[in-house]
Amino acid sequence: MDTIGVMRVLLRVSLIAVASCVLFPGCRNTPPPAACGPVPSQRQQQWQALERYAFLHFNMNTFTGREWGLGGEDPAQFDPTALDCRQWIRMLKAAGFKGAILTAKHHDGFCLWPSAYTEHSVKNSPYKDGQGDIVREFADACRAEGMKMGLYLSPWDRNRADYGKPEYIEYYRNQLRELLTGYGDVFEVWFDGANGGDGWYGGANETRTIDRNTYYDWPGTWQVVRELQPGAVMFSDGGPDVRWVGNEKGFAGETNWSLLKRADFAPGAADREALNAGQEDGTHWLPAEVDVSIRPGWYYHEAEDSLVRTVPQLLDIYYASVGRNASMLLNVPPDKTGRIPAVDSLRLMEFARALAAEFSKDLAADARVSASNVRGHSGKYGAMRVTDGDTATYWATDDDVRNASLTVMFDQPTVFNRLLVQEYIPLGQRVRKFRVEALTADGWRTLAEETTIGYKRILRLPTVTAKEVRLTVEEAKACPLISNLQLFCAPDVPASSGGTVAALPAAVPSANAVL
């Protein structure tokens, strides 16, 4: 072929390519949507993907029978006889938890590690003749089992004579430095909101109050964590990375924005309703963590062995936390021997089996999916992205389309009663209102009308047989981005007694209570 012939062939190919892009716009390079409002950091995204992790309240209170120690307890009282951190972590891992947070120091000031800054620690207890380091054993167990490790260090210290004075802040930060440099990677640092009140305080036996907003100089303390554990998220009533959900009963708001006006909040100084629902116009990405105990109290008490939450209650908590754009932090307290009791272990394994049954088969995975609008008609943002098993891809609409729908179409009428949907949160939380409908033998039927989605929303729906299921985003702050849509048929589980989640007895102080 001569030069002219080659040029004619190349021109013909070019014209075909251009025509294809005109007829099939999906081959165009459609730009991605712009971010909408505050967006999560990488550490926040990694944290929320854990979904379920455990709290381990184990400290002096385990042996005194209290929930909040006064600070003057004798270290000799701390004497676990068969402590086994590997037992804790193996059991939690088997039950599907991805990490655990240990109370390294609670309000009484007793330290589970041999801190160089106080004598009120395991080094003066009978445990291993004063040579023990439970934080070390915990860290080693997490590392061996591939579990994430988190640490709780109470800001309030009822043992210290200098609590309430400026010099205590340096003491607190020194202990924080010990924990964040000596035990490996930490995924979460937990700052409690309980601050100030009566206590031993070096023998003063008095009540002390502090300014919750200014005393701790929180920005300076947060900087210590950022420098020593840059991958860790920090929890408190006001973040800076993760917020308290505003209660310890086990539920996030049905409307739950991962946004908050952070400057208006501080540990121990918070609007609980705002914490529960988040704030659509929030200035920072601050997702919620639901902390709740498997027992009425946070610490082990033998009298509560018959009061461990039931599987239906634990499922309620799961749906009201992970299922409402939050994480689930379930407290599982070791007993006086230093092991998690058999009744708690059994209940957690039953819970794990129940969860597996709830989500055993994704019915949408093999179905066809269509959308009322696709961004730039591009396959990159097509409806099939919500069922491709990859949450890094997503269905998106054109910028000016904020009301749009996805329709899942089955080959045969299919029975389902659960819907799981996720937004693509790296570009922000957008959906304000959505609706779920099913095409049954009697026509289209509305199953749910809800508000926010966020990282994940899971709906318990009535059991229906449908040929099609439609998710309609009715209102959004910007063009909706949906990364995942799944449907399941869960078995019948007896409803939990006494409502969604049983409340803590009035006599048990809240771990985040404001005195």
Q: Model-predicted segments: where are they?
A:
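Bacterial N-terminal signal peptides that target proteins for export
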Residues: 2-14
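Serine/threonine-rich, low-complexity intrinsically disordered segments
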Residues: 5-6, 18, 502
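Bacterial Sec-dependent signal peptides at the C-terminal "C-region" and cleavage site
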Residues: 18-33
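Mature catalytic domains of secreted/periplasmic carbohydrate-active enzymes
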Residues: 30-390, 394-400, 407-408, 420-422, ...
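Trp- and acidic/polar-enriched beta-sheet ligand-binding modules for extracellular glycan
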Residues: 398-404, 425-494
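Extended extracellular/luminal ectodomain segments enriched in beta-structured repeat modules
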Residues: 403, 411-418, 466
